[in-house]
Amino acid sequence: MDIRPAEISEILKSQIASFDSEANVAETGQVLSVGDGIARVYGLQNVMAGELVEFPSAGLKGMALNLENDNVGVVIFGDDRQIREGDTVARTREIVDVPVGRGLLGRVVDALGNPIDGKGPLTDVTRTRVEVKAPGIIPRKSVHEPMQTGLKSVDALIPIGRGQRELVIGDRQTGKTTVILDTFINQKPINQGTDESKKLYCIYVAVGQKRSTVAQIVRTLEEQGAMEYSIVVAATASDPAPMQFLAPYTGCAMGEFFRDNAMHAVIAYDDLSKQAVAYRQMSLLLRRPPGREAYPGDVFYLHSRLLERAAKMNDAHGAGSLTALPVIETQAGDVSAYIPTNVISITDGQIFLETELFFKGIRPAVNVGLSVSRVGSSAQIKAMKQVAGSIKLELAQYREMAAFAQFASDLDASTQKLLARGARLTELLKQPQFTPYPVELQVAVIFAGVKGYLDAIPTDKVVEFERRLVAELRGAQKDILDAIRNDREVKSETEAKLRSFLEGFVKNFTV
C-alpha cells in the first residue's frame, strides 16, 4: 500500500480547520415508569415547573408538573403507549405555548393549537404562553358595554356585559350549550359590519365531550354562518386528561390576543366540571394529597386563575375585552357541590337552567329567580332598561303568588290579574333555538308584554301572537325597530308609534 504523507497532512489540516469547538449540550433524563398519561423521569435536575419536555423516540411532548427530590412527574400530551421505560426525555427550556391570532378564525384546533379540521396549516399566527398572569386592577375598567345574547330571558333579566364572567349552570340536557351557540350566532350582524370596536369574536372550548357532539357544534356554526368569526378548541373525551386540563387555558390565550389588541372576544368553556375531573385524575396519579370529593387542594385556583383573565381593559390599554361564559354541569340540580360553589363564587353571576322548566316546554329553561347578573343594568342599553325594569318585578310577584294560589280557591281581581300577566310574560320569554333576536326587536316584544297588550290574548296563543308580531315588526313596521336601534332608547314619539301599532295589531289579531 502506497502512503502519501502530503495527502494525509492535507486531510488532517482540512479536518482541523472545520472542527467546531461548540458542543451541543442537552439536559436529558430517563423514563423510570409510565402509565395513565403520567411519566416519572429521573434526571432533568434544572427543569422548571410547567416546562415543556420532549420524548424524542415517541415524538411526543409533556409538561413537568411535579418536581420532587429524586424524580420529575411529567404529564404527557398524547398517547403514553408509545413511551417505554428507559426512553430519553429532553428539556426544551420553554413554557407551553400555543398559536394565537386572526389566522385561527374559522378553524378547529386541539389543546396544543394544532389544526384538526383538515384545512391545512395555520397562517397569520404568532405564539404566546398558555399560562399568563391575569390583568391587574389598574388596567381594568368597569363593565359597561352590553354583550347581547339574543335571548329575551337573558338580555332582559340577566344582562351580560363585555368583560364579565357569567356562569351557565344546570343539569345535563337542559340547553346549556344552546345558550352559548345562540350567543355566538347573535353576533353575526355586528361582525358583518366594518366597525372593529363593535365586533365580537367567539371562542368555543369543548372539554371532555364526544367527538360527534363537537362535530355537530361546528356544523351548526357553519350552517348559521358563525364559524367565520369563531375558533373551536377541542379536547374530546378520547383525548388524554392533560389535554382536557390544558384546553381552557389554550382557548383563553387565543381570546387574550383580541382583548390585548383593542378588540372584543367571548369565550365559552364547555364545561369546567370535566376539566376539574381531568385535573383530579392527573393530581391523584401524581400522588398529590386529595381533598374534598377527592379533588386536589388547588382546584379553586385552577378555575380562578383561568376566569380572572376575562376582563374589560381601560382606554389606556386599548379598551378591549374578554367575556367568559363557563359552563358547569350539576348532578340532580345540586348547586351546593364543591365545583359548582367554587365557580359561582368566582364568576359575576349565573344563568341557572332547570330540568323541570325544560320539560314543561319553557325553553330556554332559565330559572329567573335563582339566576343573577352581578353587573346588572349597567350592561344594558337605555331602551332595554326602560322595558325590562318592570318585567323583573312582575315575574317575581307572579312566582310568589303562584305558590300561594295553589291553596286558595277564591282570589281577588288584582291577584288574578297578576297571575294572568305573569303566565303571559313567561310564555313571551320562550324562544326556539338558533333564532336569536336583535335587541331592538326584544325591546318591542317585551314592551307589548309589560304594557298589558297581551292581557286579552289567551295564554296558549301568546307564542303565535309573538310570531306574527315579529313578522309585522320586521316588515311593515321596520321604522319602529330602526328608531330603537339608532336612538338606543324608546323616545316618546317612538313609544307613541309603537302603542298605536300594538293597539291596532291586538284588535286585528284573530286566532
Curated annotation (Swiss-Prot):
Which CDD domains does the entry mention? ATP-synt_F1_alpha_C, ATP-synt_F1_alpha_N, F1-ATPase_alpha_CD
Where are the residues marked Required for activity as a site?
Answer: S371
Return the InterPro entries for the record: ATP_synth_asu-like_sf, ATP_synth_asu_C, ATP_synth_asu_C_sf, ATP_synth_F1_a_nt-bd_dom, ATP_synth_F1_asu, ATPase_a/bsu_AS, ATPase_F1/V1/A1_a/bsu_N, ATPase_F1/V1/A1_a/bsu_N_sf
Keywords, alphabetical: ATP synthesis, ATP-binding, Cell inner membrane, Cell membrane, CF(1), Hydrogen ion transport, Ion transport, Membrane, Nucleotide-binding, Translocase, Transport
Q: Which GO terms describe its molecular function?
A: ADP binding; ATP binding; proton-transporting ATP synthase activity, rotational mechanism
| Localisation per UniProt entry | Cell inner membrane
User: What's its EC?
Assistant: 7.1.2.2
Q: Which Pfam families match?
A: ATP-synt_ab, ATP-synt_ab_C, ATP-synt_ab_N
Q: Name one GO cellular component term.
A: plasma membrane
Which membrane topology describes this protein? Answer: Peripheral membrane protein
Q: Which reaction does it catalyse?
A: ATP + H2O + 4 H(+)(in) = ADP + phosphate + 5 H(+)(out)
Q: Which residues bind ATP?
A: G170, D171, R172, Q173, T174, G175, K176, T177
Provide the assembly information.
F-type ATPases have 2 components, CF(1) - the catalytic core - and CF(0) - the membrane proton channel. CF(1) has five subunits: alpha(3), beta(3), gamma(1), delta(1), epsilon(1). CF(0) has three main subunits: a(1), b(2) and c(9-12). The alpha and beta chains form an alternating ring which encloses part of the gamma chain. CF(1) is attached to CF(0) by a central stalk formed by the gamma and epsilon chains, while a peripheral stalk is formed by the delta and b chains.
**What HAMAP family does UniProt report for this protein, alphabetically?**
ATP_synth_alpha_bact
Mind telling me which PANTHER family this protein's record contains? ATP SYNTHASE SUBUNIT ALPHA, MITOCHONDRIAL
Report the family membership. Belongs to the ATPase alpha/beta chains family.
Q: What does this protein do?
A: Produces ATP from ADP in the presence of a proton gradient across the membrane. The alpha chain is a regulatory subunit.
Q: Which NCBIfam families match?
A: atpA (TIGR00962), PRK13343.1 (NF009884)
Protein name stated in the entry: ATP synthase subunit alpha
Give the species this sequence originates from: Granulibacter bethesdensis (strain ATCC BAA-1260 / CGDNIH1)
User: Organism classification, top ranks?
Assistant: Bacteria, Pseudomonadati, Pseudomonadota, Alphaproteobacteria, Acetobacterales
